[in-house]
Amino acid sequence: MELLSPAGNVEKLAYAYQYGADAAYIGLRQFSLRVKADNFYADEYEQVAALKRQFPGRRLHCALNIAFHNRDIDAFLGQLDYFKLYPIDAFIVQDLGIVPILQKHFPHAQLHVSTQASVTNREAVKMYRSMGFSRVVLAREVSLAEVREIKDAVPDMEIECFAHGAMCIAYSGRCLMSAYLTGRSAQSGFCSHTCRWEYDVLADAKKLAESGALVLRERKRPDALFPVYEGDGFTAVLSSKDLRMIEHLDDMRRAGVDSLKIEGRMKSVYYVAMVTRAYRKALDALAGTITAEEAAPFIASLDEVAHRESTTGFFYGRAEADKTTVGASDSPYVLAGTVGAEYDAAQTEAVFAAGAEMIAARERERAAMHPQARAAAERDETAHPEKCPAALQKRAGWHLYPYVSLNKTDAGTELEIITPDVLKTVLTAERYVFANPKNGAILSFVNPDHDCALYTDLLIPAGALVRTKDAEYERGVVRTTGR
């Protein structure tokens, strides 16, 4: 089975491929149902093409799954030359009006039916096959038994199913709640996820609500009660659990699924990498290239990624899918940063030379001072050592890497290095140093706006993630702010 991962921008595309995806799906400009994802713009086609060369054999799918109005068709036609610059292998569409345009201008790209089309039966699949589609992304509402029936009826049609991620309480994209409450339509890519918002009542009704006596009752159905106040004082109206099928991949394979899809173009780099890695290992175990015991810790690491309560959705029956949850997804870790390719010898020497020059310049400045001024400067340095940082010093067997800080991290904080094939490696304080690569100064902390390098005794592949434990995390307690 193919592993298909989300890529909301170029960086996420790189991590999807590096951490094990056979294919990734992206959105281009305003024609994707994840408009709030970064999507792809400007000259990023050059970076995408470079990634395809770096990871030969990996596929690129492009979501053009909005409901096209005339203005959208005109806008797309006006940008055809731009779209042709991308090495797209397949388009994911729901609107049939765009199909003849794609077939004319992208004759070598495959057509995939989007889950937004809500395909749930074999006759619909036959129809799409006759129109030139090679794959259908089945609606999440289809059971595994129905998947098997569809595959048997149309064996030459590839079947793609979501295996992991958020689920909509409605048929995909057909919910009107966001449009009604906020004016932001799910069919145009602007879903505000109002179903997952947490609602309470105003002060006058709060005591009644807290008692549990305040409920909504439908006029003709007196036994159908909906509590207005629940959980930690708030009600999530229609918040579905997250889909998780990693423990049931063999069932999906036997049902005839050709491609496993991970939801989440708006999720973080950390989410994309960790979830892709877990499913890659699970699929490798299923194929027999690694053992189940080797895959197990990677599968367990899914709990270290932001998630809600999980479910198997509709695959084994509707009862499981109808269960809702409350609260935001959460994670015990904070993504601290990413590691680039190791500096070469000349680059490394330049950093050390910059550090030596920084110290020499400081000493020259002190030597030129009046004795009293020099003494005052030395006292100030003793009281505030951060004003005069030490220079990075060479250590045998250590390596220097570019480091992109994504959250403030104090030097000495325990770091966990995440790579595609190593579950995690812990770097304690004595095993690494943060430094400024421009002046060679040792840093006491790093921020996203800092120039930074990581100096360590560990060999780290480019693209490794660095995480730290979240001090505010409590197991079993879901924070309403999310992470």
What are these regions (language model features)?
Residues 9-12, 30-105, 109-122:
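Active-site beta->alpha loop and helix N-cap motifs at the rims of alpha/beta catalytic domains
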Residues 1-19, 23-33, 59-64, 71-77, ...:
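Surface-exposed amphipathic alpha-helical tracts and adjacent flexible/coil segments at the periphery
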Residues 91-94, 116-120, 134, 138-142, ...:
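Short, well-structured alpha-helical patches and their helix-loop capping segments
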